A protein has these predicted regions:
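Non-heme di-metal
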Residues: 1-134
Length: 134
């Protein structure tokens, strides 16, 4: 029996999902700023997708499933962007947090690190943390 690579294992566990529009929910008093600040970070979703594309355009190790995992993650970024924009449509945005997120985005775009490293850091430090809230 052939053992799956770590990338193939991850791909085999993924479930297809489709973002759906949401209605405005109740927000706990005092959490509005945190909600709006987290939603502002949605501006990083499609750049993460682009970082993955830049990584795909470079030479990569020939590990089975690596390329497929990166392509699958790109689709996830599109879905995350759509889902977060549904929440924005329901709850609205606040310009000061939108500006803050764009400032953070500029810093990430200017960072010299490998694009896949940038994508991995953003996924683990930002999106793995905030997406469960939405």
């Amino acid at each position: 029996m052939t053992q799956l690579s770590p990338y193939d294992q991850v791909i085999s566990r993924k479930r297809k999902w489709t973002p759906l529009a949401v209605q405005k929910g109740e927000v706990v008093e005092g959490s509005e700023d945190a909600l709006k600040r987290a939603l502002g970070l949605r501006h990083l979703e499609l750049p993460v997708r682009e970082f993955l594309q830049q990584g795909l355009d470079r030479e990569l190790p020939n590990t089975p499933g690596l390329r497929e995992a990166l392509l699958s993650n790109q689709k996830d970024e599109e879905n995350h962007d759509l889902a977060l924009n549904y929440v924005i449509k329901a709850h609205g945005a606040e310009e000061k947090y939108e500006d803050e997120a764009r400032h953070i985005l500029r810093a990430w775009l200017d960072a010299p690190e490998h694009p896949i490293l940038k994508a991995a850091i953003l996924e683990r430090s930002v999106f793995f943390v905030i997406l469960p809230f939405f």
